[in-house]
């Protein structure tokens, strides 16, 4: 009740049911600043205990030029598709659930790209294979490659096979 009263007064802004934040004032003294997409992503990934993957990340990695309309989050316990603010959110199963910090997330995203190789829009599986091999695997050091191999053990056999072929 107190939070909703403060929300009506403008002291707090409601994100969703039970979640509020205190808006920052801009330099010009204007009211609320817009909530940026990165802040929304951070909030969702912390709430769902996962990391962002899918077509949105594959676009950022340079694997496709298509822009994603749905944001995919890999979580240990997927929930059904929902809408948050102006974003469509889809949750998929995370194959590696016990990563201690966010330093492993780029490797997990790379393994997700290998897993979804045939389903990445606007490109072929062979093209993705060549890009992943040239852009990522050739630039990694031996300890990084060992991390990728250890993380790949929790992925399906097709991912392990592609990683073995690349490292060949």
Which ranges hold each PLM region?
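Short N-terminal helix-initiation segments at or just after the protein's N-terminus
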Residues: 31-35, 53-56, 166
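Hydrophobic alpha-helical interaction segments
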Residues: 95-168
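A short, charged helix-loop
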Residues: 85-94, 98
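Alpha-helix initiation and capping sites
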Residues: 34-35, 47-52, 104
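Short beta-edge/loop segments at beta->alpha junctions of small alpha/beta modules
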Residues: 1-46
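Short amphipathic alpha-helical patches
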Residues: 26-30, 43-44, 64-68, 80-87, ...
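Short gly/ser-rich loop at a beta-strand->alpha-helix junction or flexible surface loop bordering the NTP-binding
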Residues: 14-19, 43-85
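Short, charge-rich amphipathic segments
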Residues: 37-47, 119-128
């Amino acid at each position: 009740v107190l939070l909703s009263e403060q929300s009506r007064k403008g002291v707090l802004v409601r994100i969703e049911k039970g979640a509020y934040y205190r808006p920052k004032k801009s330099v010009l003294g204007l009211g609320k600043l817009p909530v940026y997409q990165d802040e929304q992503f951070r909030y969702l990934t912390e709430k769902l205990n996962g990391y962002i993957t899918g077509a949105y990340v594959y676009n950022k990695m340079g694997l496709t030029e298509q822009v994603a309309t749905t944001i995919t989050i890999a979580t240990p316990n997927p929930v059904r598709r929902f809408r948050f603010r102006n974003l469509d959110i889809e949750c998929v199963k995370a194959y590696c659930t016990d990563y201690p910090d966010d330093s492993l997330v780029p490797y997990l995203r790379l393994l997700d790209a290998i897993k979804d190789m045939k389903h990445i829009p606007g490109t072929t599986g062979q093209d993705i294979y060549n890009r992943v091999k040239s852009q990522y695997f050739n630039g990694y050091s031996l300890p990084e490659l060992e991390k990728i191999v250890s993380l790949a053990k929790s992925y399906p056999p097709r991912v392990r096979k592609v990683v073995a072929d690349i490292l060949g």
